[in-house]
Amino acid sequence: MNYDKLMRKCFNLAKKGHTSPNPMVGCVVLDESGNIISQGYHKKYGENHAERDALLKLKNGEERNGTLIVNLEPCNHYGKTPPCSDLIVERGIKKVIISNKDPNPVASGGIQKLENAGIAVVTGVLEDEGKKLNEVFFTNIIKDRPFIVLKTASTLDGKISTKNGDSKWITSDKARDCAHKLRKKYDCILTSSSTVLADNPQMKHYKKNCIHEFVRFDAGIVQPKNYVSLCRSRWNSMWFFLKRRFG
C-alpha cells in the first residue's frame, strides 16, 4: 500500500479548507480491500473535522475493517464537534495512518484511544511535509506566538519608488498574485501609516469567507478622512497603534 501517495492526497484535500485557528486536515477512507470509498476535509472552523466529513458520507458500513488516512492525529475532545476518535472506533476502522501527532494538549490523545480500542496506528508518514502544511498551527501551539510572513517589494538597487512618487508598480503580475494569496491565507494584515497615506491600499483578497483583522502602525494620527470608513467595509476588525506626542 502506497501510504505516501494517499497522504499527499490528504494534504491536497486539506488545502481546500480555510480553517484558522484550526489546522488544515484531509482524510481518505479505504475499504477492507484497499479501495478508496470516501474522502473529506475540514472546510471551516466550527464545521465537521476531516474524519467526520469522510465517515458520515458512508451509510452502509463499507468502512468496517478498513483503513483511514489522515494528516493529523484525530481529536479526542468535545469542542465544536464530538471527538473524531470516538467515531473512528464506532465505525469499525482497523487501521489509521497519520502524518503528524497533534501538539495541542487540549485535542491530543486520539492515538492512545484508538490503540486502546485495538486499532493499529501508524504515525510519521511524510511527517515533515505535514508540518510544513500546518506550519502556522504548529507555531501557534508549540511556540505560543503568531506565524509571521514579511511581504516587501523593492527594486534591484533597494528602492521602493521613484523620488517623485509617480511610479505605480515595481512588482510583476506574478508577485502581486503572490501577495493576494498571502492575504487570503493569513488572518491579519499589518501595514504602516506611510503606506496608507501614499497608496491608500485596498488590501483585497479573492477568497470568500475569509475573516481578517487589519492592523496599522502610525507615526502620527494623520489619515485620509474616508480611510476608516473604507476599512470598516473591508475588514472584520481594525487595530490602530498610535504614537503619542508629548511636549
Residue ranges and their predicted role:
Residues 21-24, 147-148:
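Short, small/polar residue-rich loop motifs at catalytic or cofactor-binding pockets
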Residues 27-28, 151:
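Generic short beta-strand
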Residues 29-129, 239-242:
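Zn2+-dependent cytidine deaminase-like catalytic core
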Residues 71, 184-185, 246:
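Alpha-helix C-terminal capping/helix-to-coil transition sites in glycosyltransferase folds
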Residues 139-140, 145, 149-152, 156-230, ...:
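Active-site ligand-binding patch in enzyme domains
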